[in-house]
Amino acid sequence: MTSSPTVNLLDLDAQGLVAYCDSLGEKPFRARQLQRWIHQYNAADFDGMTDLAKSLREKLKGRATISMPGIVSDHISTDGTRKWLIDVGNSNAVETVYIPEETRGTLCVSSQAGCAVNCRFCSTGKQGFSRNLTTGEIIGQLRMAEFALRASRGVDGGRATGGDGKGERVVTNVVMMGMGEPLLNYDAVVPAMRLMLDDNAYGLSRRRVTLSTSGVVPMMDRLGADLPVALAVSLHAPSDPLRDMLVPLNKKYPLRELMAACQRYLKVAPRDFITFEYCMLDGVNDSEAQARELLAVTRDVPCKFNLIPFNPFPESGLIRSKPEQIKRFAQVLMDAGVITTVRKTRGDDIDAACGQLAGAVKDRTRLAERTGKAAKIIEVRAV
């Protein structure tokens, strides 16, 4: 007779924990207790869960774990940005980045080891695609960062000190903008985001959790039906021929389909606009004429633009737009009444800036070298 495999409780959202407790003959309130211990009190084992019956603790010891991925490295930039390299096994690693600001703290979370989309301006895509992360590996990034940051600030709201478990929240915003395309790992990403939003876990609002996608249209519709959080779309070009080159996924879901999906999403979104991200590439997509094209393409979608100065890496063959050209491009958009920001480069001294999340990981995975070819874009069907 073989024993059942152990369950990593980090892989379970509230509904999953209720179902798991039911399988042990336990009532739903036990699931809520477990969730608080794991996500609010940072419990690493079951012995310290003092309000659980001893019999339940013994059951859990033999059947469940709270397994976090290991930390390979932890670097802090001169601007306060902090980057962790996270070991997810089999020579794969992902990166998690915390960006402190005066009124908020934003955590950039990865969803895949590598990325299959292979955008030309993104160093992560150049390492190829290895695998999807599990729900536990995704929410584990938030859990790890929140409690590491609390410890570094001397903040402890845990139960052992008489706190309510929530303490002084350090991570106030989460952006699913790290390594990978979140909508190509839908079944793991959505439960992780449910935990981010759950008041019994991290208690973030839907406006403070943003998912960034390169434009996986069927899954955008599915996300709108299941869990409409704030949405950012990696646009980067005002025409299909150029976007086909910069974002290969565009060949499957061209701009017309993408804009229609954005309109549908806005009907259920927690914000009344879509954020369009646009990487500024010298002589490629940064002319004033292209800014006007961009306005025409997005005219039916309430939006704001986030212009991102390109962070160069050797394999790209691309150059960052000059600051004065970025300013001229932005002015065209603003003159049309569209809110436009230019992203401030953060953490570039530790390779934590936008598009740089491959650095040390690329050397660890060497995926392109092992496969000898770029990963193919995953076929996606809405279910």
From Swiss-Prot:
Its cofactor is [4Fe-4S] cluster. Specifically methylates position 2 of adenine 2503 in 23S rRNA and position 2 of adenine 37 in tRNAs. m2A2503 modification seems to play a crucial role in the proofreading step occurring at the peptidyl transferase center and thus would serve to optimize ribosomal fidelity. One of its GO terms (biological process) is tRNA methylation. It is found in: Cytoplasm. PANTHER family: 23S RRNA METHYLTRANSFERASE, RADICAL SAM CORE DOMAIN-CONTAINING PROTEIN. Its EC number is 2.1.1.192. GO terms for cellular component: cytoplasm. It catalyses: adenosine(2503) in 23S rRNA + 2 reduced [2Fe-2S]-[ferredoxin] + 2 S-adenosyl-L-methionine = 2-methyladenosine(2503) in 23S rRNA + 5'-deoxyadenosine + L-methionine + 2 oxidized [2Fe-2S]-[ferredoxin] + S-adenosyl-L-homocysteine; adenosine(37) in tRNA + 2 reduced [2Fe-2S]-[ferredoxin] + 2 S-adenosyl-L-methionine = 2-methyladenosine(37) in tRNA + 5'-deoxyadenosine + L-methionine + 2 oxidized [2Fe-2S]-[ferredoxin] + S-adenosyl-L-homocysteine. Gene3D superfamilies: 1.10.150.530, Aldolase class I (3.20.20.70). S-adenosyl-L-methionine binds at G180, E181, S212, S234, L235, H236, N311. This is Dual-specificity RNA methyltransferase RlmN. Binds 1 [4Fe-4S] cluster. The cluster is coordinated with 3 cysteines and an exchangeable S-adenosyl-L-methionine. The keyword Nuclease does not apply. The active site is at E95, C354. Coiled coil: none annotated. Belongs to the radical SAM superfamily. RlmN family. Disulfide bonds join C108-C354. Keywords: 4Fe-4S, Cytoplasm, Disulfide bond, Iron, Iron-sulfur, Metal-binding, Methyltransferase, rRNA processing, S-adenosyl-L-methionine, Transferase, tRNA processing. Residues 101-349 form the Radical SAM core domain.
